[in-house]
Protein backbone atom coordinates (compact mmCIF):
# COMPACT_ATOMS: atom_id res chain seq x y z
CA UNK A 1 0.00 0.00 0.00
CA UNK A 2 1.33 3.43 -0.94
CA UNK A 3 2.45 6.01 1.59
CA UNK A 4 3.83 9.54 1.60
CA UNK A 5 7.19 10.49 3.08
CA UNK A 6 7.23 14.17 4.03
CA UNK A 7 10.36 16.09 4.97
CA UNK A 8 9.15 19.34 6.50
CA UNK A 9 10.68 22.62 7.51
CA UNK A 10 10.64 24.29 4.09
CA UNK A 11 8.57 27.47 3.53
CA UNK A 12 6.31 27.06 0.49
CA UNK A 13 6.84 29.76 -2.12
CA UNK A 14 5.45 29.92 -5.63
CA UNK A 15 2.30 29.57 -7.71
CA UNK A 16 -0.44 26.94 -7.57
CA UNK A 17 -3.26 26.68 -10.11
CA UNK A 18 -6.54 25.55 -8.55
CA UNK A 19 -8.35 22.59 -10.14
CA UNK A 20 -12.05 22.18 -10.80
CA UNK A 21 -14.27 21.54 -7.79
CA UNK A 22 -14.92 17.92 -6.92
CA UNK A 23 -18.09 18.83 -5.04
CA UNK A 24 -19.45 20.58 -8.14
CA UNK A 25 -18.40 18.19 -10.89
CA UNK A 26 -19.92 15.10 -9.26
CA UNK A 27 -23.54 16.39 -9.14
CA UNK A 28 -23.08 17.96 -12.59
CA UNK A 29 -22.02 14.55 -13.91
CA UNK A 30 -25.14 13.07 -12.31
CA UNK A 31 -27.17 15.78 -14.05
CA UNK A 32 -26.09 14.35 -17.41
CA UNK A 33 -28.74 11.65 -16.89
CA UNK A 34 -31.38 14.36 -17.41
CA UNK A 35 -30.42 15.06 -21.03
CA UNK A 36 -28.96 13.31 -24.06
CA UNK A 37 -25.52 14.93 -24.07
CA UNK A 38 -23.54 17.08 -21.65
CA UNK A 39 -20.04 18.46 -22.29
CA UNK A 40 -18.18 19.27 -19.05
CA UNK A 41 -14.81 21.06 -18.89
CA UNK A 42 -12.36 21.81 -16.06
CA UNK A 43 -12.93 18.32 -14.68
CA UNK A 44 -10.31 17.39 -12.03
CA UNK A 45 -8.37 14.13 -12.24
CA UNK A 46 -9.66 12.38 -9.12
CA UNK A 47 -10.65 8.85 -8.17
CA UNK A 48 -14.13 10.08 -7.17
CA UNK A 49 -14.59 11.41 -10.72
CA UNK A 50 -13.50 8.00 -12.04
CA UNK A 51 -16.04 6.34 -9.76
CA UNK A 52 -18.84 8.57 -11.06
CA UNK A 53 -17.77 7.78 -14.63
CA UNK A 54 -17.92 4.08 -13.80
CA UNK A 55 -21.39 4.52 -12.30
CA UNK A 56 -22.76 6.44 -15.29
CA UNK A 57 -21.33 3.84 -17.67
CA UNK A 58 -23.06 1.11 -15.66
CA UNK A 59 -26.36 2.86 -16.39
CA UNK A 60 -25.61 2.80 -20.11
CA UNK A 61 -24.13 6.25 -20.63
CA UNK A 62 -21.35 6.70 -23.14
CA UNK A 63 -18.43 8.85 -21.98
CA UNK A 64 -15.80 10.45 -24.17
CA UNK A 65 -12.72 11.58 -22.24
CA UNK A 66 -10.56 14.38 -23.61
CA UNK A 67 -7.42 14.53 -21.51
CA UNK A 68 -5.35 17.66 -20.96
CA UNK A 69 -2.29 18.06 -18.76
CA UNK A 70 -4.16 19.40 -15.73
CA UNK A 71 -7.81 18.54 -16.39
CA UNK A 72 -10.29 16.41 -18.29
CA UNK A 73 -13.10 17.26 -20.62
CA UNK A 74 -16.01 14.84 -20.46
CA UNK A 75 -18.68 14.38 -23.11
CA UNK A 76 -21.42 12.28 -21.52
CA UNK A 77 -24.06 10.76 -23.79
CA UNK A 78 -27.01 9.58 -21.70
CA UNK A 79 -29.47 9.09 -24.57
CA UNK A 80 -29.44 5.31 -24.16
CA UNK A 81 -29.72 4.69 -20.43
CA UNK A 82 -30.68 1.03 -20.09
CA UNK A 83 -30.01 0.18 -16.44
CA UNK A 84 -31.78 1.95 -13.58
CA UNK A 85 -29.89 0.17 -10.77
CA UNK A 86 -26.86 1.73 -9.07
CA UNK A 87 -25.02 -1.31 -7.81
CA UNK A 88 -23.49 -1.63 -4.35
CA UNK A 89 -20.04 -2.49 -5.72
CA UNK A 90 -19.79 1.00 -7.23
CA UNK A 91 -21.89 3.05 -4.81
CA UNK A 92 -20.00 1.80 -1.74
CA UNK A 93 -16.90 3.66 -2.95
CA UNK A 94 -18.46 7.12 -2.83
CA UNK A 95 -21.42 8.77 -1.10
CA UNK A 96 -21.99 11.11 -4.04
CA UNK A 97 -23.36 8.11 -5.94
CA UNK A 98 -26.70 8.83 -4.24
CA UNK A 99 -27.10 11.78 -6.63
CA UNK A 100 -28.15 9.52 -9.50
CA UNK A 101 -31.34 8.73 -7.56
CA UNK A 102 -33.15 11.99 -8.36
CA UNK A 103 -32.26 12.14 -12.08
CA UNK A 104 -33.06 8.47 -12.76
CA UNK A 105 -36.38 8.73 -10.97
CA UNK A 106 -37.32 12.02 -12.60
CA UNK A 107 -36.48 11.05 -16.19
CA UNK A 108 -37.28 7.34 -16.16
CA UNK A 109 -39.81 6.97 -13.34
CA UNK A 110 -37.81 4.34 -11.50
CA UNK A 111 -34.49 3.92 -9.70
CA UNK A 112 -32.79 1.38 -7.47
CA UNK A 113 -29.76 2.79 -5.69
CA UNK A 114 -27.59 1.12 -3.08
CA UNK A 115 -27.21 2.93 0.21
CA UNK A 116 -23.97 4.88 -0.18
CA UNK A 117 -20.43 4.59 1.21
CA UNK A 118 -17.50 7.04 1.23
CA UNK A 119 -15.58 8.61 4.12
CA UNK A 120 -16.38 7.23 7.57
CA UNK A 121 -17.11 10.59 9.21
CA UNK A 122 -20.59 10.16 10.57
CA UNK A 123 -23.99 8.78 9.71
CA UNK A 124 -24.97 11.26 6.97
CA UNK A 125 -28.31 9.45 6.50
CA UNK A 126 -30.40 9.65 3.34
CA UNK A 127 -33.64 10.44 5.19
CA UNK A 128 -33.95 13.95 3.74
CA UNK A 129 -33.30 12.70 0.21
CA UNK A 130 -36.14 10.22 0.59
CA UNK A 131 -38.50 12.70 2.26
CA UNK A 132 -38.28 15.30 -0.50
CA UNK A 133 -38.71 12.70 -3.26
CA UNK A 134 -41.75 11.30 -1.47
CA UNK A 135 -43.15 14.83 -1.32
CA UNK A 136 -42.88 14.86 -5.13
CA UNK A 137 -45.01 11.72 -5.31
CA UNK A 138 -42.39 8.97 -5.35
CA UNK A 139 -43.04 5.58 -3.80
CA UNK A 140 -39.91 4.60 -1.89
CA UNK A 141 -38.89 1.54 0.11
CA UNK A 142 -35.55 0.39 1.47
CA UNK A 143 -34.88 -3.32 1.08
CA UNK A 144 -31.68 -5.36 1.26
CA UNK A 145 -29.52 -2.24 1.40
CA UNK A 146 -31.12 -0.59 -1.64
CA UNK A 147 -33.38 2.42 -2.07
CA UNK A 148 -36.21 1.39 -4.41
CA UNK A 149 -38.00 4.40 -5.89
CA UNK A 150 -40.75 4.64 -8.48
CA UNK A 151 -43.44 7.02 -9.65
CA UNK A 152 -46.60 6.63 -11.69
CA UNK A 153 -46.00 9.17 -14.42
CA UNK A 154 -43.94 12.28 -13.73
CA UNK A 155 -42.87 13.51 -10.33
CA UNK A 156 -45.06 16.37 -9.12
CA UNK A 157 -43.93 19.81 -8.10
CA UNK A 158 -44.16 20.39 -4.37
CA UNK A 159 -43.41 22.77 -1.52
CA UNK A 160 -40.85 21.25 0.83
CA UNK A 161 -39.02 22.51 3.91
CA UNK A 162 -35.79 20.72 4.80
CA UNK A 163 -35.70 19.96 8.54
CA UNK A 164 -31.99 20.74 8.49
CA UNK A 165 -29.67 22.20 5.91
CA UNK A 166 -28.32 19.38 3.75
CA UNK A 167 -26.06 19.81 0.73
CA UNK A 168 -26.70 16.30 -0.54
CA UNK A 169 -30.48 16.40 -0.18
CA UNK A 170 -30.69 19.86 -1.76
CA UNK A 171 -28.78 18.53 -4.76
CA UNK A 172 -30.99 15.47 -5.17
CA UNK A 173 -34.13 17.58 -4.81
CA UNK A 174 -33.02 20.03 -7.50
CA UNK A 175 -31.98 17.22 -9.84
CA UNK A 176 -35.39 15.60 -9.44
CA UNK A 177 -37.49 18.77 -9.64
CA UNK A 178 -36.19 20.09 -12.97
CA UNK A 179 -38.23 17.45 -14.85
CA UNK A 180 -41.16 17.34 -12.41
CA UNK A 181 -44.65 18.41 -13.42
CA UNK A 182 -45.27 21.91 -12.06
CA UNK A 183 -43.52 24.22 -9.65
CA UNK A 184 -41.31 23.09 -6.78
CA UNK A 185 -40.42 25.41 -3.91
CA UNK A 186 -37.59 24.24 -1.67
CA UNK A 187 -37.05 25.98 1.67
CA UNK A 188 -34.02 25.92 4.01
CA UNK A 189 -31.78 24.86 1.13
CA UNK A 190 -28.02 24.61 1.29
CA UNK A 191 -26.35 27.60 -0.38
CA UNK A 192 -22.90 26.25 -1.21
CA UNK A 193 -21.17 27.59 -4.35
CA UNK A 194 -21.17 24.06 -5.73
CA UNK A 195 -24.98 24.01 -5.60
CA UNK A 196 -25.00 27.37 -7.37
CA UNK A 197 -22.75 25.83 -10.03
CA UNK A 198 -25.08 22.85 -10.46
CA UNK A 199 -28.11 25.12 -10.83
CA UNK A 200 -26.30 27.31 -13.35
CA UNK A 201 -25.41 24.21 -15.36
CA UNK A 202 -29.00 22.95 -15.25
CA UNK A 203 -30.30 26.33 -16.42
CA UNK A 204 -27.86 26.17 -19.32
CA UNK A 205 -29.44 22.79 -20.11
CA UNK A 206 -32.84 24.49 -20.27
CA UNK A 207 -34.06 24.18 -16.68
CA UNK A 208 -35.96 27.02 -15.01
CA UNK A 209 -34.39 27.56 -11.58
CA UNK A 210 -34.50 30.81 -9.62
CA UNK A 211 -33.40 31.78 -6.13
CA UNK A 212 -29.99 30.31 -6.90
CA UNK A 213 -27.58 30.90 -4.03
CA UNK A 214 -30.38 31.55 -1.54
CA UNK A 215 -32.10 29.29 0.98
CA UNK A 216 -35.31 29.31 -1.12
CA UNK A 217 -35.04 27.71 -4.55
CA UNK A 218 -37.91 27.82 -7.05
CA UNK A 219 -37.98 25.31 -9.91
CA UNK A 220 -40.48 25.23 -12.76
CA UNK A 221 -40.34 21.72 -14.14
CA UNK A 222 -39.70 21.15 -17.84
CA UNK A 223 -40.74 18.30 -20.14
CA UNK A 224 -37.12 17.77 -21.16
CA UNK A 225 -33.67 19.34 -21.04
CA UNK A 226 -31.29 20.00 -23.91
CA UNK A 227 -27.63 19.40 -24.70
CA UNK A 228 -25.17 21.86 -23.17
CA UNK A 229 -21.53 22.64 -22.43
CA UNK A 230 -20.43 23.79 -18.99
CA UNK A 231 -17.17 24.68 -17.22
CA UNK A 232 -16.94 23.60 -13.57
CA UNK A 233 -16.03 26.26 -11.00
CA UNK A 234 -12.68 26.07 -9.14
CA UNK A 235 -12.34 24.11 -5.92
CA UNK A 236 -12.59 26.35 -2.84
CA UNK A 237 -11.61 23.45 -0.56
CA UNK A 238 -8.40 22.87 -2.50
CA UNK A 239 -7.73 26.62 -2.46
CA UNK A 240 -8.34 26.83 1.29
CA UNK A 241 -6.03 23.89 1.89
CA UNK A 242 -3.17 25.58 0.05
CA UNK A 243 -3.90 28.85 1.84
CA UNK A 244 -3.35 27.00 5.13
CA UNK A 245 -0.25 25.34 3.66
CA UNK A 246 1.30 28.75 3.05
CA UNK A 247 0.50 29.79 6.62
CA UNK A 248 1.69 26.63 8.39
CA UNK A 249 5.04 26.60 6.54
CA UNK A 250 5.63 30.36 6.99
CA UNK A 251 5.54 30.66 3.22
CA UNK A 252 4.20 32.86 0.44
CA UNK A 253 1.86 31.35 -2.16
CA UNK A 254 -0.11 32.78 -5.06
CA UNK A 255 -3.18 30.73 -5.96
CA UNK A 256 -4.66 31.26 -9.41
CA UNK A 257 -7.96 30.28 -10.98
CA UNK A 258 -10.08 30.93 -7.88
CA UNK A 259 -12.71 33.62 -7.35
CA UNK A 260 -11.91 35.51 -4.17
CA UNK A 261 -15.55 35.93 -3.15
CA UNK A 262 -16.07 32.17 -2.68
CA UNK A 263 -13.04 31.91 -0.39
CA UNK A 264 -13.54 35.19 1.44
CA UNK A 265 -14.72 33.49 4.64
CA UNK A 266 -11.51 31.42 4.62
CA UNK A 267 -9.43 34.52 4.00
CA UNK A 268 -11.07 36.42 6.85
CA UNK A 269 -10.37 33.59 9.29
CA UNK A 270 -6.71 33.49 8.22
CA UNK A 271 -6.41 37.26 8.55
CA UNK A 272 -7.76 36.88 12.08
CA UNK A 273 -4.79 34.61 12.87
CA UNK A 274 -2.34 37.25 11.65
CA UNK A 275 -1.69 35.84 8.18
CA UNK A 276 -1.61 38.31 5.29
CA UNK A 277 -4.21 37.52 2.60
CA UNK A 278 -4.55 39.68 -0.51
CA UNK A 279 -6.87 39.33 -3.51
CA UNK A 280 -4.91 39.37 -6.78
CA UNK A 281 -6.02 39.16 -10.40
CA UNK A 282 -7.80 35.79 -10.81
CA UNK A 283 -6.67 34.57 -7.42
CA UNK A 284 -5.31 35.21 -3.96
CA UNK A 285 -1.90 35.61 -2.30
CA UNK A 286 -1.23 34.25 1.18
CA UNK A 287 1.88 35.35 3.08
CA UNK A 288 3.06 34.48 6.58
CA UNK A 289 3.57 37.58 8.75
CA UNK A 290 5.32 37.78 12.12
CA UNK A 291 3.23 35.37 14.18
CA UNK A 292 0.30 32.99 14.18
CA UNK A 293 -2.48 33.77 16.66
CA UNK A 294 -4.86 31.15 18.04
CA UNK A 295 -8.49 31.83 17.07
CA UNK A 296 -11.73 29.96 17.62
CA UNK A 297 -13.60 28.33 14.75
CA UNK A 298 -17.08 26.93 14.16
CA UNK A 299 -18.05 24.96 11.07
CA UNK A 300 -21.43 25.85 9.60
CA UNK A 301 -23.30 25.57 6.31
CA UNK A 302 -22.18 28.08 3.69
CA UNK A 303 -21.55 31.00 3.97
CA UNK A 304 -20.13 29.69 7.25
CA UNK A 305 -16.76 27.98 7.49
CA UNK A 306 -16.66 24.69 5.57
CA UNK A 307 -16.46 21.46 7.54
CA UNK A 308 -14.19 20.16 4.76
CA UNK A 309 -11.52 22.61 5.95
CA UNK A 310 -11.86 22.02 9.68
CA UNK A 311 -9.08 19.41 9.91
CA UNK A 312 -6.65 21.58 7.94
CA UNK A 313 -7.38 24.58 10.14
CA UNK A 314 -6.83 22.46 13.24
CA UNK A 315 -3.36 21.54 12.00
CA UNK A 316 -2.60 25.24 11.70
CA UNK A 317 -3.86 25.93 15.22
CA UNK A 318 -1.62 23.24 16.74
CA UNK A 319 1.38 25.57 16.33
CA UNK A 320 -0.41 28.85 17.04
CA UNK A 321 0.24 31.17 19.97
CA UNK A 322 -2.49 30.53 22.51
CA UNK A 323 -5.52 28.28 22.82
CA UNK A 324 -8.34 27.80 20.31
CA UNK A 325 -11.69 26.03 20.41
CA UNK A 326 -12.82 24.32 17.21
CA UNK A 327 -16.51 23.43 17.10
CA UNK A 328 -17.76 20.94 14.51
CA UNK A 329 -21.45 21.60 13.81
CA UNK A 330 -21.94 19.60 10.60
CA UNK A 331 -20.77 16.00 11.10
CA UNK A 332 -20.27 13.88 14.16
CA UNK A 333 -17.08 11.84 14.42
CA UNK A 334 -15.03 14.32 12.39
CA UNK A 335 -12.14 14.57 14.82
CA UNK A 336 -10.50 11.29 13.82
CA UNK A 337 -7.35 13.18 12.82
CA UNK A 338 -6.85 14.36 16.42
CA UNK A 339 -5.04 11.24 17.76
CA UNK A 340 -2.69 11.36 14.77
CA UNK A 341 -1.90 15.04 15.31
CA UNK A 342 -1.26 14.25 18.97
CA UNK A 343 1.27 11.59 17.86
CA UNK A 344 3.13 14.50 16.29
CA UNK A 345 3.14 16.45 19.55
CA UNK A 346 -0.09 18.43 19.28
CA UNK A 347 -1.97 19.30 22.48
CA UNK A 348 -5.66 18.68 21.70
CA UNK A 349 -8.55 17.70 23.96
CA UNK A 350 -11.87 16.60 22.45
CA UNK A 351 -15.11 17.24 24.33
CA UNK A 352 -18.17 16.27 22.33
CA UNK A 353 -18.26 18.34 19.16
CA UNK A 354 -15.47 20.62 20.35
CA UNK A 355 -11.70 20.31 20.20
CA UNK A 356 -9.61 22.50 22.49
CA UNK A 357 -6.25 23.12 20.83
CA UNK A 358 -3.38 24.47 22.90
CA UNK A 359 -0.69 25.74 20.58
CA UNK A 360 2.77 24.23 20.94
CA UNK A 361 6.14 25.53 19.79
CA UNK A 362 6.34 23.00 16.98
CA UNK A 363 5.23 19.56 15.85
CA UNK A 364 7.52 16.56 15.37
CA UNK A 365 7.49 14.11 12.50
CA UNK A 366 5.93 10.69 13.12
CA UNK A 367 4.28 7.74 11.41
CA UNK A 368 0.59 8.59 11.09
CA UNK A 369 -2.49 7.14 9.40
CA UNK A 370 -5.22 8.91 7.44
CA UNK A 371 -8.81 8.08 8.39
CA UNK A 372 -10.54 10.08 5.65
CA UNK A 373 -9.92 12.54 2.83
CA UNK A 374 -9.68 15.77 4.79
CA UNK A 375 -7.78 14.17 7.68
CA UNK A 376 -5.15 12.94 5.23
CA UNK A 377 -4.38 16.43 3.95
CA UNK A 378 -4.40 17.89 7.47
CA UNK A 379 -1.62 15.46 8.39
CA UNK A 380 0.35 16.48 5.30
CA UNK A 381 0.12 20.11 6.41
CA UNK A 382 1.25 19.10 9.89
CA UNK A 383 4.18 17.20 8.41
CA UNK A 384 5.21 20.16 6.28
CA UNK A 385 5.43 22.30 9.42
CA UNK A 386 7.95 20.04 11.18
CA UNK A 387 11.72 19.99 10.81
CA UNK A 388 11.76 16.19 10.53
CA UNK A 389 10.25 13.25 8.63
CA UNK A 390 6.57 12.29 8.65
CA UNK A 391 5.26 9.08 7.07
CA UNK A 392 1.58 9.12 6.11
CA UNK A 393 -0.19 5.79 5.55
CA UNK A 394 -3.54 5.00 3.85
CA UNK A 395 -3.16 7.81 1.33
CA UNK A 396 -5.77 6.34 -1.04
CA UNK A 397 -8.17 8.79 0.62
CA UNK A 398 -6.09 11.67 -0.72
CA UNK A 399 -6.56 10.84 -4.39
CA UNK A 400 -10.33 11.01 -4.00
CA UNK A 401 -10.24 14.79 -3.59
CA UNK A 402 -6.87 16.35 -4.44
CA UNK A 403 -5.36 16.42 -7.92
CA UNK A 404 -1.56 16.26 -8.12
CA UNK A 405 -1.19 17.45 -4.52
CA UNK A 406 2.41 16.31 -4.10
CA UNK A 407 3.40 17.82 -7.46
CA UNK A 408 1.76 21.15 -6.70
CA UNK A 409 3.38 21.37 -3.26
CA UNK A 410 6.78 20.10 -4.42
CA UNK A 411 6.82 22.73 -7.17
CA UNK A 412 6.64 25.30 -4.36
CA UNK A 413 9.50 23.85 -2.33
CA UNK A 414 7.96 20.95 -0.41
CA UNK A 415 9.72 17.58 -0.15
CA UNK A 416 7.04 14.89 -0.48
CA UNK A 417 7.61 11.44 -1.97
CA UNK A 418 5.04 8.75 -2.73
CA UNK A 419 6.41 5.25 -2.26
Swiss-Prot record:
It is an enzyme of class 2 (transferase). Keywords: Cell cycle, Cell division, Cell shape, Cell wall biogenesis/degradation, Cytoplasm, Peptidoglycan synthesis, Pyruvate, Transferase. Pathway: Cell wall biogenesis; peptidoglycan biosynthesis. Phosphoenolpyruvate binds at residues 22-23. The active site is at residue 119. It is found in: Cytoplasm. UDP-N-acetyl-alpha-D-glucosamine binds at residues 95, 308, 330. It catalyses: phosphoenolpyruvate + UDP-N-acetyl-alpha-D-glucosamine = UDP-N-acetyl-3-O-(1-carboxyvinyl)-alpha-D-glucosamine + phosphate. It comes from the Bacteria. It holds the Pfam family EPSP_synthase. GO terms for biological process: cell division; cell wall organization; peptidoglycan biosynthetic process; regulation of cell shape; UDP-N-acetylgalactosamine biosynthetic process. GO terms for cellular component: cytoplasm. Its main location: cytoplasm. The keyword Transferase applies. Its EC number is 2.5.1.7. GO terms for molecular function: UDP-N-acetylglucosamine 1-carboxyvinyltransferase activity. The modification 2-(S-cysteinyl)pyruvic acid O-phosphothioketal is found at residue 119. Cell wall formation. Adds enolpyruvyl to UDP-N-acetylglucosamine. Belongs to the EPSP synthase family. MurA subfamily. This is UDP-N-acetylglucosamine 1-carboxyvinyltransferase. It comes from Rickettsia bellii (strain OSU 85-389).
Amino acid sequence: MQKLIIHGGKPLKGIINISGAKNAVLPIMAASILTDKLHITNVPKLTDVSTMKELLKSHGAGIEIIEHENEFELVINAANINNLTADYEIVRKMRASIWVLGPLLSRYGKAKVSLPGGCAIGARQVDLHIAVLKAMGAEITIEDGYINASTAGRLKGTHFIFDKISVGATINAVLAAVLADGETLLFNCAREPEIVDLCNCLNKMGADISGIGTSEIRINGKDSLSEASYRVLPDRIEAGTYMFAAAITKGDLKLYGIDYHIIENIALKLIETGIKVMPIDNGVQVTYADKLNAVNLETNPYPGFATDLQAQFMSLMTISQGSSIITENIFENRFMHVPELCRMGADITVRGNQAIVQGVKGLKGAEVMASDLRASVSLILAGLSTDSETVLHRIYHLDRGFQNLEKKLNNCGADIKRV
